[in-house]
Design a protein with these regions (language model features):
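Short, flexible, glycine/charge-rich loop motifs used to bind or transfer phosphoryl groups or to couple energy/partner
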Residues: 25-27, 68-70, 88
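Envelope-exposed proteins and targeting segments
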Residues: 34, 60, 77, 94-96, ...
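Active-site-proximal beta-strand/loop segments in catalytic clefts of secreted hydrolases
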Residues: 41, 69, 82, 112-113
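Solvent-exposed loop/turn segments connecting transmembrane beta-strands
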Residues: 44-49, 89-90, 119-120
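A short, hydrophobic beta-strand-centered structural micro-motif
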Residues: 66-85
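Amphipathic beta-strand/beta-sheet edge segments enriched in Tyr/Trp
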Residues: 90-114
Length: 139
């Protein structure tokens, strides 16, 4: 019984501590995505997040444009995001959530959760590139 309890505890801790990525696509994009306007989130204090997002979309053949207040009229696709960081000696990104909208309706979401990642100090690019790739796959 004790061995079973210990095994169960280790399995539970492993599941909770893993890095997870979740992508949801409630709706298909009506056509190819060539431009995504990214709404700047001034509450996110992760310095390179906009560069990481821009480069991630460019790698997938999608141009980006940044806006802070008014959504540009010629942008059908808009990305909103939030991200959080933690500290263990130095800051690192532990969570990011991306929402892709088409004409105001959510068509896809993607979330990165670091948990008790074995490498929390990996670059933000290494953490978000697979999330971005999965978010736009099939568009």
């Amino acid at each position: 019984m004790r061995l079973f309890s210990t095994t169960l505890l280790i399995a539970a801790l492993t599941l909770v501590s893993c890095t997870t990525t979740h992508v949801g696509k409630p709706r298909e994009a009506p056509g190819p995505v060539s431009l995504i306007c990214i709404q700047e989130n001034s509450r996110v204090v992760i310095d390179d997040i906009l560069d990481v997002l821009d480069q991630g979309f460019l790698r997938n053949g999608i141009e980006t444009r940044l806006f802070s207040v008014s959504e540009p009229e010629d942008c059908s696709y808009v990305l909103t995001y939030t991200a959080r960081r933690s500290w263990i000696g130095v800051p690192f990104m532990r969570y990011a959530h991306l929402r892709l909208l088409y004409e105001g309706s959510v068509i896809a979401t993607a979330t990165y959760t670091g948990g008790l990642d074995t490498n929390p100090y990996a670059s933000n690019r290494d953490k978000l590139d697979p999330v971005i790739d999965e978010l736009v796959s099939g568009f």
